[in-house]
């Protein structure tokens, strides 16, 4: 009996991938991101296994082997992604060794133990509304 091409491992390299829905890619929040923020979002999304949303990290130990050298670039890109509503901080990081945890804004929250965020207040799709919120310093001129 022949093997189905759809289930064939020859169809693609590797068995893991980053799922970035078109609704996210086409959103104004994603489109407004700079190149560094988009790249960082993909590198953080790479950690998602299907059961760990809410426990993704953006620490130096994880990002340095992926080519992220500048702490300033990572900080600015991370702030940009969080402001866009694409990444939600679920646990605040603390020195000396407690990493901040994040959740991808287009997936439901999987991890609820050990997070600082109330799981009842977490909503997917916050990136859809983030583009509607004016930036700080926006004038109310007519």
Question: What residue ranges belong to the model's regions?
Answer:
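Short recognition helix of helix-turn-helix/winged-helix DNA-binding domains
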Residues: 1-61, 65, 109, 113, ...
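Generic signature of intrinsically disordered, low-complexity, basic-rich segments
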Residues: 33, 73, 80, 126-127, ...
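Winged helix-turn-helix DNA-binding recognition segment
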Residues: 36, 47-108
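Electrostatic interaction modules used in gene-expression and signaling proteins
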Residues: 87-103, 110-115, 128-142
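A recognition module on extended beta-rich or small alphabeta surfaces enriched in W/G with H and D/E
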Residues: 120-126
């Amino acid at each position: 009996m022949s093997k189905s091409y759809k289930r064939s491992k020859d169809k693609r390299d590797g068995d893991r991938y980053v799922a970035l829905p078109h609704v996210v890619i086409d959103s104004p929040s994603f489109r407004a991101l700079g190149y560094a923020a988009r790249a960082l979002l993909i590198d953080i999304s790479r950690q998602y296994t299907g059961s760990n949303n809410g426990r993704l990290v953006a620490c130096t130990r994880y990002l340095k082997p992926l080519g992220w050298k500048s702490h300033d670039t990572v900080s600015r890109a991370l702030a940009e992604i969080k402001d866009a509503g694409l990444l939600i901080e679920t646990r605040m990081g603390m020195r000396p060794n407690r990493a901040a945890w994040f959740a991808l804004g287009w997936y439901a929250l999987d991890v609820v133990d050990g997070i600082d965020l109330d799981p009842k207040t977490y909503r997917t799709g916050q990136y859809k509304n983030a583009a509607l919120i004016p930036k700080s310093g926006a004038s109310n001129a007519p």
